[in-house]
């Protein structure tokens, strides 16, 4: 197994892989203060004899170590570069990177299909969030013609770079699809100025503060009452559990899958 991106999630994934005796083939990260160091020591577990390599070493690491799955929690541009090498090498992927533009995500999916590899792609690997999405979808189906306003509020730690979160955007896409619209037609990112709420719009709001791991709330409100569907991640362990399940799921498969597929396969 190959880890692409050694930030907070990358380190947590490595810890769990060590605990489950996964064979870790390599770690790739561009940070100069990490390159050359032992990945296990950096993650706070034990010395593994696996040095962190620069992205330009990815091809060599693949040729030397021959991983069967690559897990990418980097950033959109890095993920696109990584996927080109990984896909051409015939290695399956688990991709939790967020912040893709529509065209970038389309390019990524085309690359996976063209090279006939398998990939689980999800902006959130948490089992709870994927159930949250199903609950939101069902609620919107029941209420979409009953004069309910829909707002999404997400909160994360001060270090998160993309806003709104990939999870919030995916939530909005699910809602828009149920309403038979394109998200671009309905999305209202934050609010300012002096005007009433537009009928049918989906409000999307982002909070960045402290060390919040991840919170997502959907409000469905009408005159006289309100429903709230909420998911709160207490720690990154919620995401890591899903990543491990996705790694097990994607081995030997071809095509593009979501965490819903992983959950329905009984692996999460």
Label every model-predicted segment:
Residues 77-89, 96-121, 130-138:
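Rossmann-fold NAD(P)-binding glycine/threonine-rich loop
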Residues 4, 8-65, 144-268:
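C-terminal substrate-binding/catalytic lobe of Rossmann-fold NAD(P)-dependent oxidoreductases
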Residues 130-147, 163:
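Rossmann-like NAD(P)H-binding beta-loop-alpha module
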Residues 70-71:
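N-terminal Rossmann-like NAD(P) cofactor-binding module of classical short-chain dehydrogenase/reductase
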Residues 25, 53, 94, 118-120:
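Structural detector of well-ordered beta-strand residues that form the stable sheet scaffold
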Residues 30, 98-100, 124-125, 155-157:
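Short, ordered loop/turn segments at secondary-structure junctions
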Residues 67, 113-122, 222-229:
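Glycine/charged-rich beta-loop-alpha catalytic/anionic-binding loops adjacent to active sites
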């Amino acid at each position: 197994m190959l880890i692409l991106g050694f930030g907070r999630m990358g380190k947590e994934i490595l810890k769990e892989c060590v605990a489950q005796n996964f064979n870790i083939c390599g770690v790739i990260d561009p940070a100069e203060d990490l390159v050359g160091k032992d990945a296990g020591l950096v993650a706070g577990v034990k010395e593994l004899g696996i040095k962190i390599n620069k992205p330009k070493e990815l091809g060599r690491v693949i040729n030397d170590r021959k991983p069967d799955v690559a897990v990418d929690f980097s950033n959109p541009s890095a993920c696109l570069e990584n996927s080109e090498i990984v896909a051409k090498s015939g290695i399956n992927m688990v991709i939790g990177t967020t912040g893709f533009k529509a065209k970038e995500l389309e390019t990524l999916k085309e690359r996976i299909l063209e090279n006939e590899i398998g990939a689980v792609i999800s902006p959130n690997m948490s089992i709870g969030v994927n159930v949250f999405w199903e609950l939101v979808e069902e609620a919107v189906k029941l209420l979409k013609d009953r004069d309910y306003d829909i707002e999404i509020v997400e909160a994360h730690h001060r270090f998160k770079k993309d806003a709104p979160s990939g999870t919030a955007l995916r939530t909005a896409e699910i809602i828009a699809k149920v309403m038979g619209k394109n998200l671009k037609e309905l999305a209202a990112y934050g609010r300012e100025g002096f005007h009433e709420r537009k009928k049918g719009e989906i409000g999307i709001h982002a909070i960045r503060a402290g060390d919040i791991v991840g919170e997502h709330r959907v409000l469905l409100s009408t005159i006289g009452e309100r429903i709230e569907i909420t998911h709160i991640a207490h720690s990154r362990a919620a995401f890591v559990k899903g990543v491990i399940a996705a790694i097990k799921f994607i081995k030997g498969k071809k095509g593009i899958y979501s965490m819903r597929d992983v959950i329905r396969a009984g692996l999460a």
